[in-house]
Amino acid sequence: MRQRRYRALAAYVGGAATMAGALIAGLISGQVLYARRTIPGAQAPPPQCGGRYGRQYEGEPIALAVLGDSTAAGYGVHTRAQTPGAMLATAVADDAQRPVVLTCTAAVGSPSAWLPAQAENVLDAGGADLAVIFIGANDVTAGVDEEQAVAFLAEAVRTLRAAGSEVVVATCPDLGAIPPILPPLRWLVRRWSRQMARAQRKAVEAEGAYTVPLGELLGPAFDADPDTLFGPDRYHPSAAGYRAAVEVVLPTVLAVLDRAAGRPQHATRPQGTGHRQGTGHRQGTGAVADGAAPVDSSARAAGDPAQTDATKGADADVAGRTPGGAVPCVSQSHSNA
C-alpha cells in the first residue's frame, strides 16, 4: 500500500515537473520571439575608423588592429572618434607618444566564424603589432555551438600570433543585461554568455594571448544604468557604453604594449586587465580620444563612463577588409550584433 502511494506521488511529481518544464519552455520561446521583434536589425554601417592617429607624434607608427562584431565596429555611434577603434588608437598614441596606424576589419553581425577571414585581412593590410578582438554575442544569440565558436576564435588568434601580433580578446559580453530580454530568458542568456566567456578565455590563453572579461566587468554597470549605456535600440551600446568598454580594455592593451616594448610596468591589476599568467599590468591613462577629457580613476573603478568632448577625426589612409572584401566596420547582414 505504501509503495503504491510512493509510486503515485512520484508519478504526480514527475507529471507536474514535465508540465512545469513545458510551460517554462513555452514562456522562453515566447520571450525569444518578443526579443527578436523588439531588437531591430542593423540599419546603417558605423563610421569607418581605420587610419592614422597621433600625427603630432614622431617615431615608427604602432600598427593596431580591431576585429570582431558590432562592439568592435562601434555600431550606432555617429562619429569616427566615438568608435572603440578610434578611442583605443588615440589612447595608445598618447600613451606611447608615437603615431598609430589602425586597421579595422570588424563587421556588424560577425560571429566567431568570420574571425579567421578578418585576421587574414589584417595581415593583407600589413599586419599589426597588437590586435584587439571583441566577439561572442552573435554566437550566443544564434545558438552556435560553444566549441565550434571558440575554435574559430582560436584559429584567428593563432594566425595573428604566428604573424608576430600580440592579441587581446574582450570576451563575450553579458547579454543578460539587455533590457528587452526578460526573465527567465535573461537568466539563461546570462549563463550562456558566461559559459562562452570562460571557454574563450581558456582557448585564447592557450594560444599565448590575453583576455579581458567584458561581461564580468561591464555587466553590472549596464544593468544599473541601461538608459545611459545602451543606445536607442536598447541592444547595442551607446557612445557612453562603448567608452566604458574601451576603459576596461585599455589597461590591458597598454600593459601588453609595454611588455612587448620592454618598458617597465606597474604591479597593480586594475579593472580590465588580462588573465594571462605572468602578465605585467598597470593603470591605463584614461585618455581615450583626441580632445577628450580623461576619465578619472574613480569613474573607471565604478564602471561609469565620463562625458566626451568634441573630438578630432583621424586621417583614413589605411583600410582593412572584412570577409568577402567588404568595407571595414560595415554591416555584413541584418544580425543584431
Regions found by a protein language model. Name each.
Residues 35-65:
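N-terminal signal-anchor transmembrane helix
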Residues 163-165:
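A short helix->loop->beta-strand "cap" motif at the edges of active sites that frequently abuts
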Residues 15, 177-213:
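Substrate-gating cap/lid alpha-helix
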Residues 148-151, 155-159, 195-202:
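Alpha-helical scaffolding segments of alpha/beta enzyme cores, especially the outer helices
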Residues 63-65, 71-151, 295, 299-303, ...:
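Conserved SGNH/GDSL esterase-like catalytic core that processes O-acyl groups on lipids
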Residues 134, 170-171:
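Alpha/beta-hydrolase-fold catalytic nucleophile elbow
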Residues 2-34, 244-337:
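Conserved catalytic region of serine esterases and O-acyltransferases that act on ester linkages
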Residues 238:
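Short, conserved phosphate/pyrophosphate- and ester-handling motifs at nucleotide-, phospho-/glycolipid
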